[in-house]
């Protein structure tokens, strides 16, 4: 099921949440709406679902204009950040709920519902928890059950609003990998909202970067990271450093891993003072002070990098951005 979003505008009082949003989502694609709080990503997701009405513009599902259809007629599955499971129902009953609530003339038989629930519980790898209650599950298990409940009605589109936001970091990583594999298995057009750059980069086929109600860039994870369309995109997708080029108004941007260090003076390198050294597993992060520049430079190097040998706070070391070979002295 493809999605076409055409000229969508939405305003709340004096606040313009969405400004002329245009986006095409291909059938079977997994797309991330990524951006800071207040950028409009959740509002856009709710408009796609039919939970919110735009002030102007159209939502097209597979060639059909559904702009005037409410959420019940759009056949979308929606997964919220906070699970929204019924506490008084078992896992089995929570998953079965959507089918049991269908009108009698289109409701599957009891045996068909049971079969479908078992299929979905197997799909989310929790078939052994059917008789448990939500309070007996971990956060990650609850979110999988919420996803199974959304999928059991066979939606044409799956929408997820920060589905892993309420989980701890380790569980989020595990569920990201699982969701990516699940999407490959079911091949369902899916859109998810996140403010987590790593989550979007790891899971999505394409990323839609949003800021202040507009789309800054659309592309694959590699495209938006390696070829950012704006300074906002560059900074939002990871840690970055900024330097002014000597005797010009040019500013260069580079990431912490795009730094070369040397204990010996070399052409193109500048002396910097080490302000902080932080081991981060396989990497070591350094904060470096260059001349009179107020912003510290962040550098990341392998923990066995020769430049780290015996290095301490307050030492002077040589530094340059790897990507720039011209004279950028300050």
UniProtKB/Swiss-Prot annotation:
**Pfam families, per database record:** ABC_tran, TOBE_3
**UniProt keyword terms in alphabetical order:** ATP-binding, Cell inner membrane, Cell membrane, Membrane, Nucleotide-binding, Sulfate transport, Translocase, Transport
Compartments where found: Cell inner membrane
**Family in the record:** Belongs to the ABC transporter superfamily. Sulfate/tungstate importer (TC 3.A.1.6) family.
Q: Give the record's membrane topology.
A: Peripheral membrane protein
The Gene Ontology CC terms held by the record are: ATP-binding cassette (ABC) transporter complex
Molecular function GO labels: ABC-type sulfate transporter activity; ABC-type thiosulfate transporter activity; ATP binding; ATP hydrolysis activity
What enzyme category does the UniProt record give?
translocase
Q: Which organism is it from?
A: Pectobacterium atrosepticum (strain SCRI 1043 / ATCC BAA-672)
Q: Which InterPro entries match?
A: AAA+_ATPase, ABC_SmlMolc_Importer, ABC_transporter-like_ATP-bd, ABC_transporter-like_CS, Mo/tungstate-bd_C_term_dom, P-loop_NTPase, Sulph_transpt1, TOBE-like
Q: How does it assemble?
A: The complex is composed of two ATP-binding proteins (CysA), two transmembrane proteins (CysT and CysW) and a solute-binding protein (CysP).
PROSITE patterns per the UniProt record, alphabetical: ABC_TRANSPORTER_1, ABC_TRANSPORTER_2, CYSA
| Residues annotated to bind ATP | 35-42
The record ties this protein, via SMART domains, to:
AAA
ABC transporter domain residues: 3-237
As for what it does, the entry says: Part of the ABC transporter complex CysAWTP involved in sulfate/thiosulfate import. Responsible for energy coupling to the transport system.
Name assigned to this protein? Sulfate/thiosulfate import ATP-binding protein CysA
Q: What EC number(s) does the entry state?
A: 7.3.2.3
User: SUPFAM superfamilies from the xrefs?
Assistant: MOP-like (SSF50331), P-loop containing nucleoside triphosphate hydrolases (SSF52540)
Gene3D superfamilies named among the record's database cross-references: P-loop containing nucleotide triphosphate hydrolases (3.40.50.300)
Spell out the reaction equation it catalyses: sulfate(out) + ATP + H2O = sulfate(in) + ADP + phosphate + H(+); thiosulfate(out) + ATP + H2O = thiosulfate(in) + ADP + phosphate + H(+)
